A protein has these predicted regions:
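An N-terminal assembly and electron-transfer interface module characteristic of large anaerobic redox
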Residues: 1-420
């Protein structure tokens, strides 16, 4: 396939006739899946080559935000970069079947690469087409417009430089770091965990409709919904004027594997650039070794932070189980949420003091007792468990031993097992 593409390229090189490079997923080579687009273009008098041409070529794709994790996406990016550096007689068409997935990140990157070299992207969404005639009309319109450009040549504009956010080095070390809101059980503990590592971290508020609006404006509209919210939360924070871009950085977790979430960082960088916040570095927080984000100023001693993080995760998981088990049975509306927030706020002291198992187990006994009392599902042991752990140490009033009859209900089985 590569040799055939090379031969076609040599044949058209002498006359510089109009040529279209077709790029897409491997299954788009099937004529039925691609609706015979290649035949359609050939019948219009235009040569067709495929992205297989660049398989053996050394084409650098360092000037992109995309995290290159998949073979076919890397090939499409290389093909777009190669096409962008060729003459105007070689143009680019990308085929996609659905936007959600890597394609949502990829399309924007391909468009940026071509636009920097003063070329445009023609994107054909094959699964959105119910009438082949409309696609044929669009392809013909593209080809005719390119022929008009050849007939009326104009001065070629300069190639634009690749613009990205700054590298997080020691000059940015003292900046406040904003992190998206992940979960009401773990997010409140994140600032304290990273404070142990020496970083000033602040959670962004929970997403709302305004987050959606900003996310749709600065992220691909077919990207997965959480990505839209995360991008929207970050842009909304800066648009609110609450944070100074010159004194702030942004952090996002990455899975380190072949997951769309690993590319959230590329979406955030691109959104910050498009919104005009070019001085805000973006930090990747990941345990995976396959993620490369140049950030020499961000260094964490995981041996120091992991014990605190580990017990914080277990603690937040216990609160989540207690909360979801209690909220539908609570005697007083809203008490489960208040207890959740109270014990998450108090847990910050565990991280500040670097308390581990002993402190977290005491807390779990206390919150177990209070959650049980909030719904009357206890056999008279709640008061005893609450007394264990000396709540006054954490600034909590010791739970009083309530009357056994008041603490119990008619159910023979407590909602939660006793914490040992």
């Amino acid at each position: 396939i590569v040799s055939y593409n090379e031969k076609v390229l040599q044949d058209i090189g002498k006359n510089k006739t109009l040529t279209v490079m077709l790029a897409g997923r491997p299954y788009h080579s099937d004529p039925l899946i691609q609706h015979k687009i290649s035949d359609m273009i050939s019948e219009m008098g235009v040569h067709v080559i495929t992205d297989d041409l660049v398989r053996d070529k050394e084409v650098g794709i360092d000037d992109i935000h995309f995290v290159a994790q998949w073979a076919y996406t890397n090939r499409i990016l290389k093909a777009a970069k190669w096409c962008a550096t060729q003459g105007k007689e070689i143009q680019f068409i990308e085929m996609t079947s659905f936007g959600c997935g890597p394609d949502a990140f990829l399309v924007d990157e391909v468009r940026e690469v071509l636009m920097r070299h003063n070329k445009s992207l023609t994107l054909l969404k094959l699964d959105d087409i119910s009438n082949i005639g409309s696609m044929k009309l669009r392809v013909r319109s593209m080809i005719e417009s390119l022929k008009l450009i050849d007939e009326h040549p104009a001065e070629t504009p300069d190639i634009k430089d690749f613009v990205t956010v700054p590298i997080y080095d020691q000059t940015y070390r003292n900046r406040k770091i904003l992190v998206p809101f992940f979960t009401p059980f773990m997010s409140p503990l994140i600032p304290s965990i990273l404070k142990v590592a020496g970083y000033d971290v602040e959670n962004l508020p929970l997403s709302n409709s305004e987050s959606c609006e900003w996310g749709l404006k600065y992220a691909n509209n077919e990207v997965c919904y959480p990505a839209t919210l995360i991008v929207g939360d970050i842009i909304k924070a800066f648009k609110s004027k609450k944070y100074d871009p010159a004194k702030t950085a942004v952090a996002i977790t990455q899975t380190g594997g072949q997951c769309r979430a690993s590319n959230y960082i590329s979406l955030i960088k691109k959104a910050l650039i498009d919104a005009g916040y070019t001085d805000v570095p973006v930090i990747s927080i990941s345990f995976g070794g396959g993620i490369e984000n140049n950030q020499p100023g961000f260094s964490v001693s995981w041996l120091k932070i992991l014990p605190v993080a580990f017990y914080s995760i277990l603690y937040s998981d216990c609160i989540a189980k207690f909360y979801y088990g209690s909220v539908v049975r609570e005697k007083e509306k809203g008490i489960s949420a208040r207890l959740r927030d109270q014990y998450l706020e108090l847990a910050d002291r565990l991280a500040d003091r670097k308390r581990r198992r002993s402190g977290s187990s005491d807390f779990i006994k206390l919150l177990h007792a209070e959650f049980c009392q909030s719904q009357g599902q206890c056999r008279g042991t709640c008061g005893e468990q609450a007394a264990i752990g000396s709540g006054s140490e954490w600034g909590i009033q010791d739970s009083k031993k309530a009357d056994k009859q008041d603490q119990c209900d008619s159910s023979p089985i407590p909602l939660f097992r006793s914490v040992r």
